[in-house]
Amino acid sequence: MKIKTKQITVTAIMLAICLVSQFFKNLSVYITGPIINAALILTVLYAGMACGIILSIITPVTSFFITGSPVMAAIPAMFPCIMIGNIILVVCVELLRKKCGKAAGFPVSIAIGAVLKAVFMGIAIALIILPTFLPAPMHKMLQVLQLQFSVTQLITAVIGGVYAVIIAAVLKKTSLAQAD
């Protein structure tokens, strides 16, 4: 696979947006989450699935380094699950947006991807990893963390998808949206 300059540029810009948004994660996951999900979706749309997958893998790591989550530090097994959740969203958008028809395909693929991402993370993280590996001093946070890694993931992915649909509509007439 040959990566083109446009793909590198789009991916770099989306990564920069993700990095800046991650500084606000301690304010609210409802600020950072939708921005990162929108960036993942837009990366797929304008740079391709491979670049979206790369960003899906990088963003959980950069988030940890920027915000330093004690839960992530205590349970490193969550990293691959978050990465896989992001990849599920990216792959759904890429594979389903064309299959569901030109007009409805993009939003439908986002909705399906958001649900599948939340279901995967809800099962893998909220129901398996957290109850099994959460250190005893953190057990009082279990219900909040389970909510954060299931329902909150659905909400932030859907909001990010709405942002992506709006941004893509605005960018539709630009050279960025034109096929190479």
Task: Write out the residue ranges for each language-model feature.
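Loop-helix junctions at membrane interfaces
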Residues: 1-180
